[in-house]
């Protein structure tokens, strides 16, 4: 790099600029009407609790700590556990598959007498270009065909395309194409969380439910880098490890049917 040892700092500085732009955008985005109504109910319930007045079941729900509320109601508890398993599938499998795309293709390029670092860059760009398309595409597809079938297709396709990338494709240029397709499904599938999760949680706990579902699996996935060397040796290299992790998609695929289809339905109150 022409920027020397400070190149990584420049990269992170550039990466934070969109976050600052989003922070500015946030100042012009109003709170939703449903949240405003729910917040007013919460304030009233807290006032009744402080004054010792009689409280309804809804009042008790509104004054509970929202994280505990996720597990208080049987139906919400069921949904929380299911979406946690789906999020764990997405996060853990994505780490175990995507991390090794650049070194895997770089190794293939090296065997063909081509510069490995250059092809590792091509691999990363191809994978992430596909992922961007997947981020955008999942939302349109879910609105057209429904949340359940599209999420199940993304899980199933991720499993198959991991085999296609790491086991079935040998041509170097085709590896870049398959890497893009793999990125479309394995990383692009993260969009299901922003599409489906808001439609599964009541307003009073929606943000808490989304934050828990999105972030809790990371407390498991973060251990991956700590054991990466051991896992690569255990599974016989990059490809063996990636294929082994792809079977996690069976878990996500299996639990999706247990959730309600929410396409075209209003957000819970």
Predicted regions span which residues?
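C-terminal ends and interior cores of transmembrane alpha-helices
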Residues: 156-170
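Helix-loop junctions at membrane interfaces in 12-TM secondary transporters
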Residues: 2-5, 167-178
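Intracellular juxtamembrane helix-capping segments at the cytosolic ends
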Residues: 188-201
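Cytoplasmic membrane-interface "Motif A"-like loop-to-helix N-cap segments
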Residues: 144-155
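Central mid-sequence intracellular linker of multi-pass
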Residues: 2-71, 250-269
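A late C-terminal transmembrane helix in Major Facilitator Superfamily
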Residues: 129, 203-235
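Extracytoplasmic gate region of multi-pass secondary transporters
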Residues: 74-133
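Interfacial helix-cap and linker-helix signal at transmembrane-aqueous boundaries
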Residues: 1-3, 105-106, 141-142, 228-236
């Amino acid at each position: 790099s022409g920027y020397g040892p400070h190149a990584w700092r420049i990269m992170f500085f550039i990466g934070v600029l969109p976050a600052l732009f989003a922070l500015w955008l946030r100042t012009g985005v109003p709170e939703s009407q449903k949240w405003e109504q729910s917040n007013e109910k919460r304030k009233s319930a807290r006032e009744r609790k402080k004054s010792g007045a009689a409280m309804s079941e809804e009042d008790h729900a509104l004054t509970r700590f929202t994280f505990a509320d996720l597990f208080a109601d049987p139906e919400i508890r069921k949904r929380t556990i299911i979406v946690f398993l789906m999020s764990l599938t997405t996060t853990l499998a994505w780490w175990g598959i995507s991390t090794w795309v650049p070194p895997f293709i770089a190794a293939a390029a090296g065997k063909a007498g081509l510069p490995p670092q250059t092809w590792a860059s091509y691999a990363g760009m191809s994978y992430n270009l596909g992922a961007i398309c997947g981020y955008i595409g999942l939302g349109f597809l879910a609105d057209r065909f429904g949340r359940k079938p599209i999420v199940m297709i993304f899980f199933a396709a991720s499993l198959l395309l991991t085999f296609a990338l790491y086991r079935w494709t040998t041509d170097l240029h085709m590896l870049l194409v398959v890497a893009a397709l793999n990125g479309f499904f394995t990383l692009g599938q993260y969009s299901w969380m922003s599409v489906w999760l808001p439609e599964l949680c009541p307003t009073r706990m929606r943000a808490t439910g989304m934050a828990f579902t999105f972030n809790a699996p990371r407390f498991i996935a973060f251990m991956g880098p700590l054991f990466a060397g051991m896992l690569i040796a255990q599974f016989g290299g990059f490809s063996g490890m990636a294929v082994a992790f792809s079977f996690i998609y069976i878990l996500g695929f299996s639990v999706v049917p247990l959730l309600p289809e929410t396409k075209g339905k209003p957000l819970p109150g």
